[in-house]
Regions:
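Glycine-rich phosphate/diphosphate-binding loop of Rossmann-like nucleotide-binding domains
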Residues: 3-67
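Glycine-rich phosphate/nucleotide-binding loop
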Residues: 52-164
């Protein structure tokens, strides 16, 4: 059944529109390698993801595409092809975000950049958070990096539609 996938596509569409994107370009990532290779590696793309995309289009969500290969859809989104990517599970979205936003200096053995922000859509409240977790390792040591927190706050403000 594709009910949950359709619901998430609808939530992604609404979130984009709420942030001023009139015609959102929504990529829906596949679950399996190579989007299942027509059922060879899994049937989720055939039985759940594609029907959800077709149902979304029937509802008038015309900018939705997929299933998109999960190993390349994020570089396409960063390149401007898509406004948002619907992922099939938590780490599918977090791995590319952290790969792009986290930079580690091996010589100094410290993080130079920790810029990821994650949001949870479909809640009755706005939720934006740092993408590095609680970071207890740096807590109380005075050596933390506030960039991700500042970015999360700025993004939450943007989500309200009140950003300047």
């Amino acid at each position: 059944m594709y009910k949950r996938q359709l619901e998430v596509i609808e939530i992604a569409n609404k979130a984009c529109k709420d942030m001023g994107i009139e015609n959102p370009r929504i990529a829906v990532a596949g679950l399996n390698p190579h989007c299942g290779e027509n059922g060879l590696f899994g049937r989720e793309e055939i039985e759940e993801i594609t029907p959800a995309i077709e149902a979304a289009k029937a509802e008038g969500i015309t900018g939705v595409v997929g299933p998109c290969p999960p190993d390349s859809v994020f570089s396409q989104a960063i390149g401007g092809w898509y406004d948002i990517v619907v992922c099939m599970y938590h780490d599918q979205g977090h791995i590319p975000l952290k790969t792009v936003g986290f930079v580690y200096d091996r010589e100094k053995q410290e993080w130079k950049a920790v810029e990821g922000v994650n949001v949870t859509l479909g809640l009755p409240i706005i939720r934006a958070s740092v993408d590095h977790g609680t970071d207890f390792y740096h807590a109380g040591k005075g050596n933390g990096n506030e960039l991700s927190l500042v970015n999360a706050i700025k993004y939450a403000v943007k989500m309200t539609g009140r950003a300047n």
